[in-house]
């Protein structure tokens, strides 16, 4: 055997090992409005999605659960969610309700006059779960409400808007407690919030720590395409993981697969073996950390394109 062939075989073995390590961590995927509604409308679309995701060892879907294009299936046709969640559960998969929408401009929900909309959005999920059969209930909630998307986000307004996010989150968590339900609720959170110290309810600490205190878990938008070194997945998650370890909370590492600038934000353009190697390094670093909740991929359509299994055209 030539050295080149031997080296190639060794590389393949190492990548396979990295992939097998990464497979041990839970994997989830964000499924946004159009793809979620397509799965809810057509069971065959959902079944095809389950097949692909299970082949890629993805065990949890963050399924959109609010209004889209004039419909709100959670309220108007809850049986569609019943059927979807039952089918996922029958395959051993979990389903979290995904809340927040670019179409609905939900970044505005951090504003005091609109925070009640965020609570109402969650309350609809809680009401659905209370009425649904056990096998058709959501397993958790993830909300993606990003105040930095507001036009008014700037240095002078940032503290006020972040306090609004915390007030909104506190109100949402109170609604969950009042419901008597125990499903975990947590936000998508940028990794850079750990660099912003904020006074809130008598305590000054990084915004990330306030959020971890408030919620059951965080999905950390840790959008980098290498595991180690400066400006990496591990470096940007370090403070959140350390704090969550101390507080008994969970951090799910969010990774990006869609095109973006700069290129370091996403695995787009890399091959799947390279991604698995980086994911394996993250899990190797965190496998003994109680805070590590696995990975969540952004997003369903982008991830499917990345692995060479694009969403079929309608």
Question: Where are the regions a protein language model picked out?
Answer:
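Alpha-helical scaffolding within the catalytic cores
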Residues: 41-49, 78-83, 124-129, 191-210, ...
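An active-site-proximal structural segment forming one wall of the substrate-binding cleft
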Residues: 112-141, 207-211
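Substrate-binding cleft of secreted/luminal carbohydrate-active enzymes
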Residues: 223-226, 247-314
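Glycoside hydrolase catalytic-domain groove-lining segments
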Residues: 170, 181, 185, 220-263
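Boundary/entry segment of secreted carbohydrate-active catalytic domains
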Residues: 22-53, 298
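Aromatic- and acid-rich polysaccharide-binding/catalytic face
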Residues: 139, 145-149, 203-232
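Active-site groove signature of glycoside hydrolases
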Residues: 65, 125-160, 296
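Aromatic-lined carbohydrate-recognition surfaces of secreted/lumenal glycan-active proteins
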Residues: 96-102, 165-203, 249-258
């Amino acid at each position: 055997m030539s050295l080149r062939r031997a080296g190639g075989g060794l590389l393949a073995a190492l990548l396979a090992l990295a992939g097998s390590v990464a497979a041990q961590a839970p994997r989830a995927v964000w499924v946004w409005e159009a793809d979620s509604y397509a799965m809810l409308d057509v069971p065959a679309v959902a079944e095809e999605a389950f097949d692909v995701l299970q082949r890629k060892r993805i065990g949890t879907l963050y399924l959109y659960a609010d209004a889209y294009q004039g419909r709100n299936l959670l309220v108007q046709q809850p049986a569609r969610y019943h059927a979807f969640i039952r089918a996922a559960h029958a395959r051993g998969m979990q389903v979290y309700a995904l809340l927040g929408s670019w179409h609905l401009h939900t970044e505005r929900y951090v504003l005091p006059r609109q925070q009640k909309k965020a609570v109402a959005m969650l309350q609809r999920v809680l009401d659905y779960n209370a009425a649904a059969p056990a096998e058709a209930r959501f397993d958790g909630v993830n909300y993606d409400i990003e105040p930095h998307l507001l036009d008014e986000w700037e240095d002078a307004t940032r503290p006020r808007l972040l306090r609004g996010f915390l007030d909104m989150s506190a109100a949402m968590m109170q609604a969950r407690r009042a419901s008597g339900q125990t499903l975990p609720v947590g936000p998508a959170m940028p990794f850079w919030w750990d660099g912003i110290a904020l006074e809130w309810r008598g305590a000054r600490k990084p915004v990330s720590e306030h959020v971890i205190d408030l919620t059951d878990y965080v999905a950390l938008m840790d959008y980098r395409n290498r595991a180690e070194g400066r400006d990496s997945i591990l470096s940007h998650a370090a403070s959140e993981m350390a704090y969550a370890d101390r507080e008994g909370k969970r951090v799910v590492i969010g990774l990006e697969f869609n095109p973006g600038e700069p290129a370091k934000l996403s695995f787009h353009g890399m091959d799947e073996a390279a991604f698995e190697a980086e994911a394996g390094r993250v899990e190797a670093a965190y496998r003994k950390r109680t805070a590590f909740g696995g990975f969540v991929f952004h997003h369903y359509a982008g991830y499917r394109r990345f692995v060479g299994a694009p969403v079929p055209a309608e």
